[in-house]
Amino acid sequence: MGIETADFGRTGHASTRVIFGAAALGAVPQRVADETLDVLLRYGVNHIDVASSYGDAELRIRPWLQREPDRFFVATKGDERTANGARAELRRSLDRLGVDHIDLWQLHSLADPIEWDVALSPGGAIEAAVEAREQGLVRWIGVTGHGAQIAATHVRSLERFDFDSVLLPYNFVTMQNSYYAANFEALYRTCQERRVAMQTIKSIALRPWTGRPHTRSTWYEPLERQDDIDLAVWWALSRPGIFLDSVGDVGLLPKVLDAASRFTEPPDDAAMTALVERSRSEPLFV
């Protein structure tokens, strides 16, 4: 039932290739969060990715870190773009998590060009991140983002600063966008060469809700059937060296973990094309 592990970039940590995306805990009670922990432990997941903006998620994780203090590689994210704002945001995250340091702190959703320049210039959030690393509050520094341009933006970010990790969307439908795919491949090569951990999201995204009732806590409509989720997860995991952040819905988490635990070989393009046609998948970003 275990999920394979791989070196998380240059950090020296062997992370499960499926990372728990803790956005799923943003609006659930502690009882549900604790049931989710039991699921993670059953599959051996050892890496948690949360954010200061994920509702109560940091608070929900706090008891886990007290109960299992050495089990998880802990990552959180901050949305502030100035150094002063980022310092305050990090202090708040540490307090909410109940820890004196974390493994990875990420500049969250860094896509807007003006925000990008502010965050990565003197007096920006990156200044606070480096300072926090020097003080032992964080061990590693990463950057995340969404959108059709984010792979290209991450390439620029790695030219500006030597980030230890990146995070961005990756699924079969998104990679049919030639612009995104070309920039993703360039980013992938850079990450492999420089031992930058590459985290991917939206593996089981189906399409935008577009007026349909929201039956899941994800902001997009996800795949639901286990066999469809199997194909999507296996396709993502078939790329060597990448990690998959799970899903922002606790009800779907067991399906993603189950799929990952049974991964042996990738589906071919014909199987993935059939999935797209059968499920009527649509891109989230254009």
How should these model regions be labeled?
Residues 23-25, 51-53, 77-81, 107-110, ...:
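Active-site beta-loop-alpha junctions enriched in small/polar residues
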